[in-house]
């Protein structure tokens, strides 16, 4: 599960970087407007993808966050969405009921409202990110209806990170 979250985080990071940061950086470096259309696609996007893909392969080969134990030792603060299921499973039954109610009722209703409200805007602005967002929405709704509470929390982790990333643009 940790590797899956890392993969989606880097996928979103690559898409956002290529769509927003690359034209700005090229404008600063070249001092002119750089088009991101079809004629310039290979010259603008591919070098960034290649370099970041090499970084991703290097991080994976170093064994970055392969298990929850390593995540707890290495990056405890950054791994809060990953550690949430462990916190829930060690809680008292009364606290589990409260957290379950909050995750299923409050967080999912807020997330589904924002997804429906901003969907047309995101389709126009970030079509690739919208596709990934629809996938995360399916995972969250599927996990909370049929899975356990820890599955719900695991599904909400990358979904919340993705939604915050979308709103920050």
Swiss-Prot record:
Pfam families: CcmF_C. Coiled coil: none annotated. It comes from the Eukaryota. InterPro entries: CcmF_C, CCMFC. It is found in: Mitochondrion. Its main location: mitochondrion. Keywords: Mitochondrion. GO terms for biological process: cytochrome complex assembly. One of its GO terms (cellular component) is mitochondrion. PANTHER family: CYTOCHROME C BIOGENESIS CCMF C-TERMINAL-LIKE MITOCHONDRIAL PROTEIN-RELATED. This is Uncharacterized mitochondrial protein ymf3. It comes from Marchantia polymorpha (Common liverwort).
């Amino acid at each position: 599960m940790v590797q899956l979250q890392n993969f989606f985080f880097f996928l979103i990071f690559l898409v956002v970087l290529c769509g927003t940061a690359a034209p700005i950086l090229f404008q600063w470096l070249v001092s002119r407007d750089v088009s991101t259309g079809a004629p310039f696609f290979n010259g603008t996007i591919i070098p960034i993808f290649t370099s970041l893909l090499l970084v991703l392969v290097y991080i994976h080969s170093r064994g970055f966050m392969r298990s929850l134990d390593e995540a707890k030792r290495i990056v405890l603060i950054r791994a809060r969405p990953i550690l949430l299921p462990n916190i829930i499973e060690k809680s008292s039954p009364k606290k589990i009921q409260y957290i379950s109610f909050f995750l299923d009722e409050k967080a999912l209703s807020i997330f589904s409202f924002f997804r429906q409200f901003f969907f047309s805007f995101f389709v126009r602005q970030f079509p690739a990110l919208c596709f990934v967002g629809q996938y995360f929405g399916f995972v969250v709704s599927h996990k909370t209806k049929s899975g356990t509470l820890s599955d719900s929390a695991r599904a909400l982790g990358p979904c919340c990170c993705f939604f915050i990333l979308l709103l920050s643009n």
